[in-house]
Amino acid sequence: MRVACSKILLMFFFFGPLLGCEDEMEKHYERPDWLQGSAYEILQGKGQYSQFLHAIDLAGFKIIVDGQGLCTVFAPDDAQFMTYLHAHGWSSVDNVPLDSLKVLAGNHIVQYSYKPDDLMNFQPNGVLNPATNPGIYYKHKTFGKDPIQVVTNPKTGRKIEVYKREKYLPVLSTDLFHFKKLADLEYNYKYFFPNSQWKGDNQFYVANASVIEGGNGIPTDNGYLYLIDNTLKPLRNIYDIVEDPSKNYSVFKSLYDRFAAITYDAQLSEKYGATSNDSIYVYYHNSLPKIASEWTFNYEGGFTENIQVASGTAFNAFVPNDAALESFIHEFFPAYQSREDIPLLALEYLLSNHIKSSNIVLPEEIKAGKVTTTYGDACDFDVDRTDVKEMCTNGVFYGINKVLVPAPFKTVTKPLFQHSEYNMFMNLLYKTGEIIQLTNPDNDYTLFIPRDEAFEAMGIRLNIGNADILGDEKFEKLNVEDGKYVEMTALELSDLVAMHVVPQKITDFNKQQVFPTKKSLTYIKVFGGGVAGEQETDEAVQVVPLGEYSNGVTYESEQLIGKTDEVLTDVLTNTEYSKFWALMKKAGLWEEINGVITIPMLAGETAMVFAPTNAAIDAAGNIPQDSASLVTFLKYFFVTLESNKVANYVMPGIGDDGMYSTLSVDVANSNIYERKYFELGLYQDVDNFRLRLTNDKGTKQCYTLSGKYPRFTTDGIIYQIETTDIQPE
């Protein structure tokens, strides 16, 4: 008996706490007293929401609202709901076409659960730092979406079925207005919703409605319920307004549709077209903001979701009406016979300057001059005189009566877009990402634009690829060995562009000068009324002024301006430098590896070489005969940029005057801890277009050949001097 009692006590000792724990778990999962049921049940209990619930039933959303899945419900009462139906010609819920009813009812149900604090200041990454961009993430995905739409493909004229995505519902909180430092909160809200009630600060407004007293964030079994004072009108997307025949934006639409990308979607076709064997498409626009989508995030970058972009990014549309846009096209594009002839690239800059993807832009910001377009131009239109002002599911729409001219149309790149004969160079600048850089208002540029035939003369052509897809173009050059065209590399394209862009203004082409291009250690020469590249030539490429702009000047060049492809040893082994090179060989300062001649002492560094002429060497009486002394003697004619920590060669008008370390070692002043090098003085004589050289003590001097450019190579430049008597003391 004692043993049995002991066993019972032990069992109670071990399992008693577990029984108590089970009671606690049951309490944890008990329905909280403060939950009042599903949103559907709560609305049923209130009595005056029967019309809204009837719409929910008919539209097929009862299962969601009644507890299956997280959702946030915004409910208008019977009076408000019927007022909306009557205003749209429906006498009862049963009279509303099912597709329209699904959109309307679904527009009141937001996916996922949002408590009041979330709607005031939604933070996609949680509430770790609620002060970050308060109110910016302002729109939320609903269950409302338009039915599959039959549209005409603007490229083919064929009828197709296009899938429409779920609409987003804007929730504008006064936190957003304060974050943007707006003074008149009511003005910014009622600008888009003039017939809605303003209920003051510290509120959020659900599109055209506000929350009524006692209806703010009622907890439900599967989310939250908000009682609102107005029926939420389903919002259009930006493209819906553009294609609305009652509005005046048909020109903008026709240009935008030049970029139409209507893509077959196998998954959507299987899901929505299975019964009718129909093909379902999605309607986007290549290279431009996807204003035909209800969403501002459309799986870009291969991601399936991006809440920050979906909730916080708006397509801010500043769309010019037909009269304004037609007038601009006629004035700016006189070289093109019709709108269809204008290149896609020009249209991309024009159109994207009117659709800014950013956080939502509100009217007071525009008034205050705080808003710029995609390319940094001022949004200088009168917001109170817009043709259309509308909050959309994917942004905001301002219908304006002027064109916001993009920066590339007003700066040194302007002629590219106005003249068809510059099409290749326009595309070249685009491919290399230079067009936007050339709009920088803080710089002065000189831009040389070759005509298309100049490219063709050099065996370069533009392969258009798919003419409907901007960016599919490829530059190709002729391979003279087999007569075939091969695609040019990114480096080749970059080098070609650089030789036509000088980061300063050039106005005098008769004075002999040299200018650095936008690429490090590449240069153009100016003389004889024109320009030349780095190759050795006595003939200048003639230029024709095209215009002077706020950030520089633009010229047409009759030929391409070329970059040298020679290296130092290619030039030094020429007859012109034969005596100097013979001394280099005698001193052992060269090496041949697999047929390639190199100068090992340069070790890949970039050098300025001051080579005595053949006549100077013949006349010299100071050339050492022993090898070691000859090495010291010859190295004094070499100055590398890297050892002197400078970024530019010294040329007339370029670089800094002063003493430069050569490669010649000053043995007397060197030790095992530090090696000293003899210095050579370099001083510009711009008037005579030459350099003056002095030895380390300034006791000897000589000049480079007057009026003669150095020889440019990819790894240095070579000046000729008329004496060897410049050695250090």
Indicate residue ranges for each PLM-predicted region:
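Sec-dependent bacterial lipoprotein signal peptides
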Residues: M1-C21
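Mature, structured domains of secreted/extracytosolic soluble proteins
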Residues: C21-E729
